[in-house]
Amino acid sequence: MDYPSKDVEFVTTGMFIIDEIEFDGGKKIKDIIGGAGSFALIGARLWTSEPESQQLGMIVDKGSDFPQVILDELNDLHTGIVYRETPWRKTTYGYNRLRDNGFRLFEYLTPKKPIRAPDLLETGLIYAKTIHIITNPKTFVSVCEELAKYGNLKNRPKIVWEPTPESCLPENWHILQKALKYCDIFSPNEVDSANLLGIDISESKSRAKEFVSAFQEFQIGHDSQGWVVLRNGSDGCLIGACTSSTNATSDAVVPVREILHLPSVQMKNGSVLDTTGAGNAFCGAAILEYYRTGNIIEACAKATVAASFVIQQHGLPAHTKNSEGIDLWNGESVFQRLKEYYEFLASHEASAIKELTKRGV
């Protein structure tokens, strides 16, 4: 079935998965929305009110066993999700074993159904202005070449690329260099970066700036105007421009070879429950806000705030509205949390961040 072309501001090629989570002690919870695509979409949705939220796209393949409770939760987001009926198969389910120390073991319970460029073409999502892609370097290049074949790269969409953990190996260093030319934001986490560089992951947090410096040496983006945004867990993120770039934000500049640090949102004790999907939400928010503002610092600040909502529960943050019809997530306004985050940055961080807060963004 072909779908009509849509006016799409954001799309993710990440998958939709329904998670089952088992904890130490044997407790289980089921029917939890998961998958990189779901979290990337919510990262974008947090910064997009209705009706504009209908321009945020994702493909959800509904198997014969798709739960109504999941459909209701997805529909409550009021996005441009495209549902494909696939009654001959089971919906993609995942099993998660979550240990008390935070370690997570994941495996698929039913076959996965990856999303590629032909799927975006079929569903009318191909001409999105921003695209979130999570895959290995070789497939990333292939997807981007397919996008070019279908005509989207002529429109120069903004692309954020998350490399998959299993592909972050030293032997993929060469293809990584080719892949980076296609993305506007390259966003690995600190562990993936260490694995790519052949460095013990026990040193990943302490050497994160070294990783950014290594990635900066490559051409990022078709015109070397791209960014490395390394996600460093509870330590926030690091932002670096391609070294051949003359990149500058509108008022706040990240000079070539300078690496800018943005801390994570300061969370209340006991408010962090599950960090799954935080990186995906970060990337979804980052690419959309970079497209909208042209300011990598502002985009990453908003992405950091988006991630903070994802870690407060298993699955997606709870969506409600206040008496004025404003979106609330876990009972809070995303804009209020951003305001508090900027206030924290103004008192704790470098002059570039203080300059950003002076602008009132």
From Swiss-Prot:
Pfam families (alphabetical): PfkB
Species whose genome carries this gene: Schizosaccharomyces pombe (strain 972 / ATCC 24843)
Stretches that traverse the bilayer: none
Gene Ontology MF terms in the entry: phosphotransferase activity, alcohol group as acceptor
Taxonomy, superkingdom: Eukaryota
Organism taxonomic ancestry: Eukaryota, Fungi, Dikarya, Ascomycota, Taphrinomycotina
Protein known as: Uncharacterized protein C16C9.01c
